[in-house]
C-alpha cells in the first residue's frame, strides 16, 4: 500500500528537489506549488479542498478549493495540516502538529493550532559544528 496519497496528482508542482516523507496526503483539487529544498515530515496533510459551512450546501455536495504555495527551503513538521489558500514563506519552519490556516511570512518558526509565528530565524539558530582534533 502506498504511503503517499493525493486527489489528482496533476495539480502538484515541484520547483526542484523536495522531500515528502511517508503517510502524507495532498488533496490537490487546486494547484499545490512546492518549492525546492522543502522538507515535509511524516503524516502531513496539504488540503486545498474544504466543505461548505452551511449544512444544506454540504448535503448537496458543495465544496471549496483554494491553491497552496510552499516556498523554497520550508520545513513542515510531522502531522501538520496546511489549509487551502495558504502561502508558507521561504525558509520558514512549521512546528509538528500545527494547523496552518493563514499565510506564514518568510524566515520564521510558526507553531500551533491555529499556527502562529513564534519568532524569526536568526544566525543564533545556526548549528554549531565542533571538530575534535
Feature annotation, model-predicted:
Residues 87-89, 104:
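Extended beta-solenoid/beta-helix repeat architectures
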Amino acid at each position: 500500500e502506498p504511503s503517499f496519497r493525493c486527489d489528482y496528482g496533476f495539480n502538484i508542482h515541484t520547483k526542484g528537489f523536495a522531500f515528502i516523507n511517508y503517510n502524507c496526503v495532498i488533496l490537490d483539487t487546486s494547484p499545490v506549488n512546492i518549492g525546492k529544498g522543502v522538507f515535509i515530515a511524516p503524516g502531513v496533510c496539504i488540503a486545498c479542498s474544504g466543505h461548505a459551512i452551511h449544512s444544506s450546501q454540504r448535503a448537496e455536495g458543495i465544496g471549496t478549493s483554494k491553491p497552496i504555495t510552499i516556498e523554497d527551503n520550508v520545513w513542515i513538521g510531522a502531522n501538520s495540516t496546511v489549509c487551502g489558500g495558504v502561502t508558507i514563506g521561504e525558509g520558514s519552519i512549521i512546528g509538528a502538529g500545527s494547523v496552518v490556516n493563514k499565510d506564514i511570512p518568510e524566515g520564521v518558526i510558526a507553531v500551533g493550532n491555529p499556527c502562529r509565528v513564534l519568532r524569526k530565524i536568526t544566525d543564533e539558530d545556526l548549528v554549531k559544528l565542533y571538530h575534535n582534533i
